[in-house]
Amino acid sequence: IHGDNKTRKGERKLHEERWQAASAAAHQHLSTPQTAAGGGRVLREVTLEMPIRYAPSDAVEKWLNNLLCLDCGSTPNRIIGGTPHPRECELYYVDRDSLFSYHKLSESFLQRIMALYVASHYKNQPNDLQLLSDAPAHHIFVLLGPQAEGQGNAGQLPDVLCVVQVALEGEISKESVAAQLSRGQRASGDLIPWTVAQQFQDNEFAGLSGARVVRIATHPDVTGMGYGSRAVELLTKYYQGELASGEFEEENEAAKPADEESDDESNLLKEKVKPRKALPPLLLPLTDRPAERLHWFGTSFGLTLQLYTFWQRSGFRSVYIRQTANPLTGEHTAIMLNALKCDDLPASPAAGWLDEFVGDARKRFMALLAYEF
């Protein structure tokens, strides 16, 4: 959703035009007799190309950049399968064991995902890659076109139209919430539950289960074509149990690969790191994976008109806007929620529970318009 490849190309072209104009003006200024005698200013552009940590063409630097996806580039692979209608595209779950197996195709697919993050102006660090690889609550979904299966059968990687990173949050006990809020503290993680509980002094919301969109990035060649909205729509249906049959259950022993050792037999001191013999499929249709049933679907982002409009069109409603702006971006952090259909869940909240948060947040925002916003 964020970022536009055409905009970046335009910025580079504008920089080159300004540089050429400034250089021509400087040469003309120096060529005149009046300025040539008295001296003049010379315009120079300095570019740093010498590595500051490694020697030139050091193999360790190349290996490290590939391992941490630091050199995936800001321009993703070109889309070769065309631009299908969003309604023809489907969302797939990415198995992280296969994604981070360092298999040749899996590694190329990971590089494509990280390239989309870079193109969408997300700040990527090695810690973000580690969080993506082994954080239990994080999941990755990709939106693919109808030709994805044909590309896979031909041994080609499918075109990634949109990638969504989701973190499961909530299900915090009332006792833990009350104890943390009474001390003016909050545990790490669970951004939306803790923020809402702290702002509204509500211990009930933190006990609900939900999912937060950590990152969502659309391929820069197809921004504004509805692929991001399609991905959010399918995720909403998925977490409402409308796409997959059954509910999510932890993997049992029978579901483990044959080469995976049990917890009793494994020992970190004796474990031998080796390639796995059997890997699960990299991409799994949502219809083949039971969903985690949730009460809400949310997002937190730096507030802009474009992003607010996007999430509002997807059925999300604003419940929190931070009073102070981010010192780096100058944007106010916003939280928007979408109440999912969860009447069949045992601990489902009363109907219209989100309306109370939205109404209270709107009153606060109106009262602070003359001050902070």
Swiss-Prot record:
A single Gene Ontology CC term: 90S preribosome
Catalysed transformations (reactions): a cytidine in 18S rRNA + acetyl-CoA + ATP + H2O = an N(4)-acetylcytidine in 18S rRNA + ADP + phosphate + CoA + H(+); a cytidine in tRNA + acetyl-CoA + ATP + H2O = an N(4)-acetylcytidine in tRNA + ADP + phosphate + CoA + H(+)
One family name in Pfam for this protein: GNAT_acetyltr_2
Residues that, per the record, bind ATP: R53
Sites where the protein binds acetyl-CoA: I216, A217, T218, T223, G224, M225, G226, Y227, G228, S229, R313
Single GO MF annotation: tRNA binding
E.C. numbers: 2.3.1.-
Gene3D superfamilies the record matches: 3.40.630.30
Keyword entries, A-Z: Acyltransferase, ATP-binding, Nucleotide-binding, Nucleus, rRNA processing, Transferase, tRNA processing
Enzyme class label: transferase
Residue segments, region Disordered: 246-271
Subcellular location: Nucleus, Nucleolus
GO biological process: rRNA acetylation involved in maturation of SSU-rRNA; tRNA processing
Primary localization class, coarse: nucleus
Superkingdom per UniProt: Eukaryota
Family under the similarity heading: Belongs to the RNA cytidine acetyltransferase family. NAT10 subfamily.
Purpose: RNA cytidine acetyltransferase with specificity toward both 18S rRNA and tRNAs. Catalyzes the formation of N(4)-acetylcytidine (ac4C) in 18S rRNA. Required for early nucleolar cleavages of precursor rRNA at sites A0, A1 and A2 during 18S rRNA synthesis. Catalyzes the formation of ac4C in serine and leucine tRNAs. Requires a tRNA-binding adapter protein for full tRNA acetyltransferase activity but not for 18S rRNA acetylation.
Name the UniProt record assigns to this protein: RNA cytidine acetyltransferase
The organism of origin for this protein: Achlya ambisexualis (Water mold)
